[in-house]
Amino acid sequence: MLATRNTTRVDGADPIADAAGVALAVYPSAAPGTHPAVVTLAPTSDWQAAIAASVLMASPLHAPVLLSGPRTLPAATRQALSLLGPSGSGAVDGAQVIRVGAVPAPRGLRAQTIAGAGPYALAAAIDRLQAALSGRPSPDVVIASAQAPAYAMPAAGWAAESGNPVLFVSRGGVPAATRQALESHGRPGIYVLGPPSVIPDSVLRQLAAYGTVKRVGAPGPAANSVAFAAYRDPPCVYGQPCAHVPGSFGWAIRSPGHGYVLLNASRPLDAAAAAALSGSADFGPQLLVDDPTTLPRAVLDYLLNYATPGYTQEGPTAAVYNHGWVIGDASAISLSVQAEVDQLLQAIPQSTGG
C-alpha cells in the first residue's frame, strides 16, 4: 500500500490482488476480533455476479469479496484466505466461505454455494440468500445494466453498505430471473443506475410493474458515479444539510468528512474487490476514473464542491476529515491523480469574511 496524508492505495496489479489487499485492510486478522466470520469467493469470469455478491458485505454476514477463476485459487486469494482464517457463521450453517458461481472449493474450509444459470439468475440467487439472512427482502433494489459494466460498478459499494441487492437488466428488457426477484420484494423502491443510453426508458416502463421506479445516473461512467454518490430519495431540502437517514435511499454525500473509493472504470471486478471499504470504516461511495492519468472533471468538481473541509479560528484540529482509497497500481490510477485527490481532501483555512 502507498499512503499520503489523506489517501491510501491498495496497490494490486489486478482485481484479484486488490480484493486480497482490501479484505486484509478491513480484516487485519492479527488480533482477536479482527478475523471475518465468512468470506465471499466470486468468479473472475462473471463481473455481474461479483458486483451482486458485494451485498454479502452488508449485515449480517459482513463478508469481504475475494476473487478466483474456475479451476484453481490464485496465489493472492489462497494466501489471503489463509491469513483471514474465517471462523464460520451460524447464519450459513457454519460456512466459512460463500462460493458464488464457477469458483473452486477452498481446501479445508466449510463452504456454501450459490448457483445460477447466467448472471441474471446468479444475482437473483444472491438476493435470495441476503433476504433469508436478513429475515426479509430489502425495501429497495438497485437495477444495473448487464451490458455496461462501468455504469454498474458504483452499485457494488452501495450494496455493501446498505444491504440493497443489485439485479440486472439488458437493453432489451427485464429477464425472467430479475422479474421473479423483484416480485419477491413486494413492490420495492426500484432505483435504476445509469442514463437512458445504458438502460432505456422502455425498460423502466417494464420495471414499473414491480415497484416504484426512479432513475439515478448521468452520461459517462465518472459522472454517473458522482450522481449516485450525491443522490438521495427523498431529495434533500435545499439549504439544509444533506445526509443519508433511516428510510432514505442513497449516499447523499454533499459535505466534507467522508470516505471515497476511487476505481478505474475499465476494471469492473475492482468494484466488487473494493466493496468492503464502502461497507466498513469510512463507508465511502465508489467514484470512477476513466483515464488513469487524469481525474475526471465530474469527480474533480464533485470534490471541489463538497469534499474539501474548511476550518476557522478553532484551528485544524476541530475540522472534519476525509479519506480516499485508491484501488489498483499506477497503471489503474496514476500517482499524480492520487496526489491531486490527496490535496482536494485536505482541510484548509476558511475565510470568515472578517
Which residues does each predicted region cover?
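Extracellular glycan-binding segments that recognize GlcNAc-based cell-wall polysaccharides
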Residues: 1-354
